[in-house]
Structure formats: structure tokens, C-alpha cells
A protein has these predicted regions:
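Positively charged n-region of N-terminal signal peptides that target proteins for export
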Residues: 1-4
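Bacterial N-terminal signal peptides
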Residues: 7-16
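N-terminal secretory-pathway/extracellular module detecting exported/lumenal segments
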Residues: 19-160
């Protein structure tokens, strides 16, 4: 037993530097840009844009008007992941995850509908434009969910 203890301690000491590496820096926070206002305010999250060839993936936030309730629960809106074909100008909404008042998310519900042409002036076309050319978005309107909800709701009030 006495010879095993030094061997274990030596093993722990040799392993410690590998385990002691600092954690990787946190991922970039959201950078939300208002893309349109209709029944809902829609914001694109520039921090989620990833492109491979003509295909781009991005997350968006749909913000509801104040006091939007379903089944007695108040909602801020919901998140969706999208893929866009920048050359074909098609959009594919992959899911929807509701956001309850206070910021609790989910669960995500998959959207099995096939990709469709992004009609000019519609939410999908506005998101596609930003996803395919993120530099056209300019500065972010919000860098967190609560601020995005405030921005979206202010835009909804102005649109009325």
C-alpha cells in the first residue's frame, strides 16, 4: 500500500497541468438586429451566422406584443433556427422554441416543412438578406434577450 500511494500521487501531479488548463473563452453573446415588424417583431442573431458555400444557418428571435398569453402563460416570443440557400433564395425554418416571460426557453419543436422561396418583403426574405450578407445589418440593436424583447416591443408599438 505504501508504494502505491506515491505512484498515485505522482500520477495525479503529472495529470494536473492538463486538467488545470483554463476553460476556453465563452462563446460570443447574441448580436440581435431588428429585421422586420409585422404581427411579430423579428430579430436576426448575427452571432449565430455560419456559412458553407451557398448555405447559411442562423438563429432568429420572434418577439410578441406585451401581455401575449397562451393557456395562462405569458410569452416574450420564440427562437427559431433557419437554413438559407443564398443562391436559390430559399428559406427553411428548422424549429421553434417558445420563450416564456422571464426568458425560459423551450422545448424546441421541429418544423418538418421543406425549404420554400423567400417572398420579397416577408420575414424569411428579410432574415435571408442578413444571413447571406451579415455586414449589411450594421450595428446590433441588442446583445441579450431582455433587450431584444424591449427593442422588438418598441418596434411593434411604433408599427401600430
Amino acid at each position: 500500500m505504501k508504494t502505491a500511494t506515491p505512484a498515485i500521487l505522482l500520477g495525479l501531479m503529472l495529470a494536473t497541468p492538463a486538467c488545470a488548463n483554463p476553460a476556453p473563452p465563452p462563446l460570443e453573446g447574441p448580436r440581435l438586429v431588428l429585421t422586420g415588424v409585422g404581427r411579430f417583431a423579428v430579430l436576426a442573431d448575427l452571432s449565430t451566422v455560419s456559412r458553407e458555400g451557398d448555405m447559411t444557418r442562423m438563429r432568429s428571435l420572434q418577439v410578441t406584443e406585451e401581455d401575449f398569453t397562451v393557456g395562462g402563460q405569458t410569452y416574450w416570443g420564440g427562437w427559431s433556427w433557419w437554413t438559407f440557400d443564398c443562391r436559390a433564395k430559399t428559406a427553411d425554418r428548422l424549429d421553434f422554441a417558445s420563450v416564456r416571460e422571464g426568458g425560459a426557453e423551450g422545448p424546441a419543436t421541429p418544423d418538418a416543412a421543406p425549404p420554400y422561396p423567400a417572398a420579397p418583403g416577408g420575414d424569411a426574405a428579410e432574415l435571408l438578406a442578413i444571413a447571406c450578407d451579415p455586414t449589411s445589418a450594421g450595428e446590433a440593436d441588442a446583445d441579450n434577450l431582455a433587450d431584444a424583447v424591449r427593442v422588438g416591443r418598441a418596434a411593434l408599438r411604433l408599427a401600430d
